[in-house]
């Protein structure tokens, strides 16, 4: 989303606040610009990549590891390490992720089920970075896929296309240990993925990346505490019978427990590796700080207006303000 569009949204919200006699004691004078999202460089490859979950090709060995994942709110360090790598060629976008886990388990096998009810790995892709029309991909250790397309974030009353399927999608799992076997201690499980550019082009209208292009992408790992019942893994429950909350470990932290804030996703820069002495370096967009600040204002005003409309009977409007 361009800065001019953000300014228009925020200005409109401020005017509406005045018209509805809403007030706030909060001052925007000391607003702190949110921390810049993570960044990563994806290298071009000419090597044939076999999607077997192992990532053993030379191209993968030379690809950069991401920073280790952190808690979604940005402070706590996860108990198990998670990292990813990325590559691309003329036909596909590739992902490889490695997740430490002493107990690797899964139960869901049906496509497009709610995969995050198991431990899973998730990818969010917004090619043009406008926070709208993005895809979400989830996989568990059974390689069960849930792929969905969102026209906009949930905060804006999104239309979720759960029936959407990524054409030509490939993935495979490698387990260093045993799946669903509580009698031993496992090492890690890994996911390898290939997404054809043609699928992105057909669904999003985005062509194959060119050198220097940057996309907004983020990654999440959902991890549950478990109970063992008759040798089988189940999500752990509390004393009242409810499930304990899951852990959400992510690449670029969101600040809140919500992955659907695309403006906070990381930057992935597409490049060709020249040699060890001439590594490409990522540079944030010139307006990055301004865009982050404008989005923080947009979210604050949206929440304030919706809360005010609900509480003031003098202004009998039902529903909420949308983007």
Regions picked out by a protein language model, each given a short descriptive name:
Residues 10-20:
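Bacterial N-terminal signal peptides
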Residues 311-323:
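Periplasmic/extracellular, small/polar-rich flexible segments of pilin-like filament-forming proteins
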């Amino acid at each position: 989303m361009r800065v001019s569009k953000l300014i228009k949204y925020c200005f409109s919200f401020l005017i509406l606040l005045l018209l509805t006699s809403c007030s706030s004691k909060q001052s925007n004078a000391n607003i702190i610009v949110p921390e810049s999202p993570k960044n990563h460089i994806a290298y071009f490859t000419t090597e044939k990549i076999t999607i077997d979950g192992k990532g053993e090709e030379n191209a993968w060995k030379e690809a950069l590891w991401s920073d280790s994942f952190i808690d979604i709110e940005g402070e706590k360090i996860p108990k198990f390490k998670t990292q990813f790598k990325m590559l691309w060629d003329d036909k596909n976008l590739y992902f490889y992720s490695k997740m430490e886990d002493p107990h690797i388990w899964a139960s869901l096998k049906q496509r497009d089920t709610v995969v995050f009810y198991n431990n899973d790995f998730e990818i969010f892709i917004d090619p043009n970075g406008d926070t709208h029309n993005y895809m979400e991909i989830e996989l568990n250790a059974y390689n069960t896929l849930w792929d969905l397309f969102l026209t906009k974030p949930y905060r804006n009353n999104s239309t979720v296309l759960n029936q959407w399927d990524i054409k030509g999608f490939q993935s495979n799992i490698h387990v260093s240990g045993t799946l669903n076997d509580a009698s031993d201690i496992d090492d890690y499980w890994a996911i390898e993925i290939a997404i054809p550019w043609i699928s992105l082009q057909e669904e999003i209208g985005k062509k194959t990346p060119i050198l220097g292009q940057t996309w907004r992408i983020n990654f999440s790992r959902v991890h549950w505490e478990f109970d063992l019942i008759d040798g089988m893994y189940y999500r752990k429950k509390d004393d009242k019978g409810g499930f304990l909350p899951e852990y959400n470990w992510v690449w670029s932290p969101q600040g809140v427990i919500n992955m659907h804030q695309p403006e906070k996703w990381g930057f992935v820069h597409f490049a060709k590796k020249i040699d060890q002495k001439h590594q490409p370096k990522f540079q944030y967009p010139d307006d990055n700080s301004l865009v982050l600040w404008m989005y923080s204002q947009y979210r604050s005003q949206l929440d304030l207006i919706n809360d005010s409309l609900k509480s003031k009977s003098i202004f009998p409007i039902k529903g909420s303000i949308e983007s």
